[in-house]
């Protein structure tokens, strides 16, 4: 299985613009699940959870009252787990920056 995400390169490493969609593609996967969390001084705050067959997508937006606003700038954590046809598990963890 191979893991591919639509990152843009920044000075700090992986990044993506606020409000865009983060797409995670994994080849030869039967089930894919993952989550995004914001890194904080006390640990992490869960933002989104997703599950799909071979492609996960996260819209980097959140609801504030009746409005939809993009995520705030900062460091976030992406954790992905995938199972293949033989039920073997593989996990990836990635830190990225919202700019």
Residue ranges and their predicted role:
Residues 88-94:
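Extracellular and select intracellular beta-sandwich modules with Ser/Thr-enriched
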Residues 26-33:
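Short proline/glycine-enriched turn/loop motifs at strand-loop junctions of beta-rich domains
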Residues 96-99:
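Interdomain boundary/hinge segments at the C-termini of tandem beta-sandwich modules
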Residues 52, 63, 72-76:
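A glycine-anchored, Pro-Gly-centered beta-turn/N-cap motif
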Residues 81-85:
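Beta-strand-rich extracellular modules
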Residues 57-71:
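Signal that preferentially marks extracellular ectodomain short beta-strand elements
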Residues 34-41:
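Conserved aromatic beta-strand anchor motif in extracellular beta-sandwich/beta-rich domains
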Residues 1-23:
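Short, compositionally biased P/S/T/A/G/V-rich stretches that sit at domain boundaries
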